[in-house]
Amino acid sequence: MASAADNSTKNGPHSGTIPPLASGDRLTRPEFERRYSAARNVRAELIEGVVYVQASVRHKQHGNPHFLLVTWLGTYIGVTPGVDGGDNSSIRLDADNEPQPDILLRIDSACGGASSIDEDGYLTGPPELVVEIAASTASYDLHDKLNAYRRNGVQEYLVWRVLDDAFDWFVL
């Protein structure tokens, strides 16, 4: 027969509680997705098995540069059949990586593109172009993310280092 102490362990205040995401957590992609789906008003990504919870976005260092690149790439999409894009869309790359790049362009899988859209609406596989606006995130955008994108077949990776007033365009 179970004691009261046994029941409090099974039905206590923390039973069924999903832990929050925190920067630096080391998680599998399924566990990351479980926690991310339970989070409210949190933007995070999983890079090489490490969680990065993203800070609020500043206008001059991120919001406006982001808007300019979305406008440019949106114009390209408008005149290029078979190409679509995403803004802060999660990408299921592999077991340790689910980045949420600022912008992506992809060739539709029916037109020969490498990515597809899962039944639950997530992008799976590498888009053809990934774009990041890097102010505070340049250290991992230019290292761990670059390596993950290269290893998973992203063809091109553009990083706008806003504070340095420089672009890095990698053909991977």
Which residues does each PLM region occupy?
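Gly/Pro/Ser/Thr-rich low-complexity, intrinsically disordered segments predominantly at protein N-termini
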Residues: M1-L172
